[in-house]
Curated annotation (Swiss-Prot):
Residues 67-77 have a biased composition (Gly residues). One of its GO terms (biological process) is positive regulation of interleukin-1 beta production. It comes from Homo sapiens. One of its GO terms (cellular component) is nucleus. The gene is EGR1. It comes from the Eukaryota. A zinc finger (C2H2-type) spans 338-362, 368-390, 396-418. This is Early growth response protein 1. Coiled coil: none annotated. The record marks 336, 347, 351, 357, 375, 379, 403, 407, 413 as: Interaction with DNA. SUPFAM superfamilies: beta-beta-alpha zinc fingers. GO terms for molecular function: DNA binding; DNA-binding transcription activator activity, RNA polymerase II-specific; DNA-binding transcription factor activity; DNA-binding transcription factor activity, RNA polymerase II-specific; double-stranded methylated DNA binding; hemi-methylated DNA-binding; histone acetyltransferase binding; promoter-specific chromatin binding.
Length: 543
């Protein structure tokens, strides 16, 4: 009984809760079998102390020694190694251990913290609970590995977890690699933390273990890291360079996303596919409305003037001038509050949507797109009329000929053709009426023009063929007397009868008839000469 008490006094409470606290470091004590024995001893010690503490409280020493004999046999194997920690107070009494009962004894640890320790074991062959690993993991990459599939710090952490959660099954017969490496590092024994004094940690940057576990990352171990069971596996360094100060977000250009052109109103699935930069035509950049207003309101600064000049160079010039630049509008200018902000444009509008539509002329914006041919338009009505070219709809018909058109302006243009035709017909009718009136006045100038040669040609033969001793003064009354009846008598009826049968549409034939008229007149003149000869005695008598 006294031997059992002395056996229990060999180990202090701190040594029982921490078996490695007083034992000298030796390679044999670092193996798992010794750890199991010390843990079982620390868990079984409260049973011995509980059995021994009851007789001490009652003052009976014989019962405690008899009940502690069984424990002495279990702890006898360690008496030689723990003789250096013999407590000299054992001879004086057990007063230092009276406050330690079976309930509070196993809760004391090295740092006065409670630890959860199982107090009952069904058998001594039960495996140890998972040991808490308090070492540090290395995050340095392996210097001489070329494969960059997995980063090294991940595997160094995983290897430590694998070796701690899966201790080798033959711990009772053969030492594990973790225990052997702990014994070779010559570190001071302190529980299971095993901190190392040298610079190399317990688990190096490239840990090695003989039997790789295929349950964790099976594909990288079978493909990227081929090796047999006995070879060491080198793990690659991280595939990324050293960490930078700021994380740079990659900027993806907007033209790779076809629906990002919200400025053009193209956020529809019918977007035209992306074209190459070579096939694109150079168009002036779109200027927002705020920038245009800034040109009008703050044109005094030099920067805005420079921007204004560059902007004016990009303006789309109209293909033609306005037909009626000074045409009066329905609304007077002072009642149109919305003015165009462009300096070179003096247009004003009574509605804001009209101004918005007008500004698109300056900016070149075309927000309305045809879903069939992907053509863009600046106005919605232009898009509506354009769609009719695809559908074949022609709602506008001509009132005169019935021809149909898709646009109203086309019908208006076509109607002008009919108006021009009407004007031509009216002109033709006027020309025809004037022609008939002019043809009705033709006989009078012909009748008056042709007797003159007859009159001039008639007196000369009459005067020259008249052989008379009458003085020269006699011929003048003869020539002046007789032409008057000839002019009034013979030529006019002969010519009138000749031209009455001539149609007015054949002036060539009219020119051919005066010869006959002249001939007739000459024949008449011959008769007149006879008449002159007949009346000559009377004339002489008168003289």
């Amino acid at each position: 009984m006294a031997a059992a008490k002395a056996e229990m006094q060999l180990m202090s409470p701190l040594q029982i809760s921490d078996p490695f606290g007083s034992f000298p470091h030796s390679p044999t004590m670092d193996n798992y079998p010794k750890l199991e024995e010390m843990m079982l001893l620390s868990n079984g010690a409260p049973q011995f102390l509980g059995a021994a503490g009851a007789p001490e409280g009652s003052g009976s020493n014989s019962s405690s020694s008899s009940s502690g004999g069984g424990g002495g046999g279990g702890g006898g194997s360690n008496s030689s190694s723990s003789s250096s920690t013999f407590n000299p107070q054992a001879d004086t009494g057990e007063q230092p251990y009276e406050h330690l009962t079976a309930e509070s004894f196993p809760d004391i640890s090295l740092n006065n913290e409670k630890v959860l320790v199982e107090t009952s074991y069904p058998s001594q062959t039960t495996r140890l609970p998972p040991i808490t690993y308090t070492g540090r993991f290395s995050l340095e990459p392996a210097p001489n590995s070329g494969n960059t599939l997995w980063p090294e710090p991940l595997f160094s952490l995983v290897s430590g977890l694998v070796s701690m959660t899966n201790p080798p099954a033959s711990s009772s017969s053969a030492p594990s690699p973790a225990a052997s490496s702990a014994s070779a590092s010559q570190s001071p024994p302190l529980s299971c933390a095993v901190p190392s004094n040298d610079s190399s940690p317990i688990y190096s940057a490239a840990p090695t273990f003989p039997t790789p576990n295929t349950d964790i990352f099976p594909e990288p171990q079978s493909q990227a890291f081929p090796g047999s069971a006995g070879t060491a596996l080198q793990y690659p360094p991280p595939a990324y360079p050293a960490a930078k100060g700021g994380f740079q977000v990659p900027m993806i250009p907007d033209y790779l996303f076809p629906q990002q052109q919200g400025d053009l109103g193209l956020g529809t699935p019918d977007q035209k596919p992306f074209q190459g930069l070579e096939s694109r035509t150079q168009q002036p950049s779109l200027t927002p409305l705020s920038t245009i207003k800034a040109f009008a309101t703050q044109s005094g600064s030099q920067d805005l003037k420079a921007l204004n000049t560059s902007y004016q160079s990009q303006l789309i010039k109209p293909s033609r001038m306005r037909k009626y630049p000074n045409r009066p509008s329905k609304t007077p200018p002072h009642e149109r509050p919305y003015a165009c902000p462009v300096e070179s444009c003096d247009r004003r509008f009574s509605r804001s949507d009209e101004l918005t539509r007008h500004i698109r002329i300056h900016t070149g914006q075309k927000p309305f797109q045809c879903r069939i041919c992907m053509r863009n338009f600046s106005r919605s009505d232009h898009l509506t009329t354009h769609i009719r070219t695809h559908t074949g709809e022609k709602p506008f018909a001509c009132d005169i000929c019935g021809r149909k058109f898709a646009r109203s302006d086309e019908r208006k243009r076509h109607t002008k053709i009919h108006l021009r035709q009407k004007d031509k017909k009216a002109d033709k009718s006027v020309v025809a009426s004037s022609a008939t009136s002019s043809l009705s006045s033709y006989p009078s100038p012909v009748a008056t023009s042709y007797p003159s040669p007859v009159t001039t040609s008639y007196p000369s033969p009459a005067t020259t063929s008249y052989p008379s001793p009458v003085p020269t003064s006699f011929s003048s009354p003869g020539s002046s007397t007789y032409p008057s009846p000839v002019h009034s008598g013979f030529p006019s009826p002969s010519v009138a009868t000749t031209y009455s049968s001539v149609p007015p549409a054949f002036p060539a034939q009219v020119s051919s008839f005066p010869s006959s008229a002249v001939t007739n007149s000459f024949s008449a003149s011959t008769g007149l000469s006879d008449m002159t000869a007949t009346f000559s005695p009377r004339t002489i008598e008168i003289c």
